[in-house]
Amino acid sequence: MANPYHHAVSSARKWGGEPNDYIEIHEWFDETKAHFGDFRHRALRHHTEGIWLMQSIFGRTITNSAGRVIPTRWIGEQHVTEDLGRLVTVQDWLSCMEPQPWMNRSRRLSRELERETAGVS
């Protein structure tokens, strides 16, 4: 499924209510497409940590238009499973990333700050 609306339709079929009851959550998962246009956008939120983050933003439950209380984690798990076939972790994504030299070029800020403060009385 490529479109948040289709995920929302799937949620409505599964738990009742209308697609609009679910669309904001599904749009949140897929809004990273604005920054990276292919499937790799999913590495930012389509994992178990992303589901927990979504819950902290949208709350533990929503009440759909049919009056049913739905755990938001269920909605997140549905979205990720529909896109990836299973729930994955951040480790699943990052372990597939090939490290590049620029990723590990941190500055020694502690030394720089020590030198700066040593010269100041």
Regions found by a protein language model. Name each.
Residues 1-121:
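N-terminal membrane-targeting hydrophobic helices
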